[in-house]
């Protein structure tokens, strides 16, 4: 077990329901989203984590899929996975993963946190790995778009080398748009005296970089973010990390839900495709107390995953079993 000194006093925690914000950004452009109700936020929350996207790397609808129902139904449109972390007391904001939809996601982040004016208003970006939905949004911080200055980008060593040595990412470093900050496995980064981020290496396809998840620890609560992993068993055998122990130690766990089950991709041998299935993770925690099951928020679901649809039978199965499904606009409190 890995200890992070988590405060498990549930009475001090606050979370907000899954208010799905309609309006979406496809690869062809962004539709207008309704103005978020910023007045409904709990003013007592000083540090909060906001879901800015819950889909797999390409979001939904996906390119080349003209029959996708999401073209006509905003409720089925997905931004790729991304979390926003805001420290209201210190006026600091951070992103976890930068997708190709980062422009729309930052607009959402601004609206939900009351940020106005020009500029990206970010104090750091934490990247999990070098697959398109998780880092490709960095390109928008370059001179062709935002023209950011010295934006801290927190990455593991292989990922740092990949960004420095390959275009167009190397240009971001050379021009000072981003400033690479090296991470080490299980070594916490202090963002303040009440907010830390700890990377945890996980098994995954590592063509260009390592892959990590993060534990984000605030004054009152903590969250685990593991959007991509090959299997929970491999995490245990290769890195001696138990997903059961991790979920027990944190208050919120945003975990890989790429595929619902092994029948999802018709005509494909899904045994050749890693990622723990939603049904597998549910079975793993089936006998856990309700207080543990409700900490799990399934995220990073593929466009084929039926939990993408809030009205699907599979969504109801997940919710009835006591688990949660992350939706864009969800927010949880890490410190009051």
Briefly describe each language-model feature range.
Residues 6-17:
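Bacterial N-terminal signal peptides that target proteins for export
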Residues 27-29:
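C-terminal motif of bacterial Sec signal peptides marking the signal peptidase cleavage site
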Residues 31-33:
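Bacterial signal peptide processing site
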Residues 36-111, 115-117, 181-246, 330-336:
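Core dinuclear metal-dependent hydrolase active-site scaffold
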Residues 87-95, 99-154:
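Active-site metal-binding motif and surrounding structural segment of the metallo-beta-lactamase
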Residues 94-96, 126, 223-225, 253, ...:
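Residue-level marker for buried hydrophobic side chains located in beta-strands
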Residues 151-159, 254:
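Short internal beta-strands
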Residues 222, 230-331:
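Cap/insert and terminal regions of metallo-dependent hydrolase folds
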């Amino acid at each position: 077990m890995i200890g992070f000194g988590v405060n498990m006093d549930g009475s001090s925690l606050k979370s907000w329901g899954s208010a799905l914000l309609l309006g979406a950004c496809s690869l062809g452009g962004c539709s207008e989203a309704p103005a978020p109700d910023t007045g409904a936020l709990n003013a007592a929350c000083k540090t909060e984590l906001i879901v800015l996207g819950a889909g797999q790397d390409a979001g939904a609808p996906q390119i080349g899929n003209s029959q996708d129902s999401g073209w006509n139904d905003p409720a089925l449109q997905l931004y790729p996975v991304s979390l926003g972390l805001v420290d209201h007391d210190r006026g600091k904001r951070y992103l976890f993963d930068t997708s190709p939809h980062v422009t729309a996601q930052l607009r959402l982040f601004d609206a939900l946190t009351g940020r106005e004016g020009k500029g990206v208003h970010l104090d750091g970006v934490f990247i999990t790995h070098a697959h398109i939905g998780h880092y490709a949004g960095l390109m928008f911080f370059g001179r062709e778009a935002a023209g950011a200055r010295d934006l801290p980008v927190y990455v593991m060593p292989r990922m740092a080398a990949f960004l420095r040595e390959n275009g167009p990412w190397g240009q971001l470093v050379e021009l000072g748009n981003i400033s690479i900050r090296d991470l080490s496995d299980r070594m916490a980064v202090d963002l303040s005296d009440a907010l830390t981020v700890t990377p945890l290496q996980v098994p995954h396809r590592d063509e260009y970089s390592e892959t990590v998840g993060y534990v984000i620890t605030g004054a009152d609560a903590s969250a685990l973010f593991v959007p991509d992993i090959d299997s929970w068993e491999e995490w245990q055998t290769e890195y001696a990390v138990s997903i059961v122990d991790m979920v027990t130690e944190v208050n919120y766990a945003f975990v890989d839900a790429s595929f619902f089950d092994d029948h999802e991709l018709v005509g494909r041998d899904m045994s050749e495709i890693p990622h723990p299935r939603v049904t597998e993770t549910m079975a793993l925690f089936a006998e856990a107390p309700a207080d543990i099951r409700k900490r799990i928020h399934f995220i990073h679901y593929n466009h084929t995953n039926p939990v993408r649809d809030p009205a699907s039978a599979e969504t109801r199965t997940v919710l009835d079993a006591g688990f949660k499904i992350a939706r864009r606009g969800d927010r949880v409190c890490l410190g009051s």
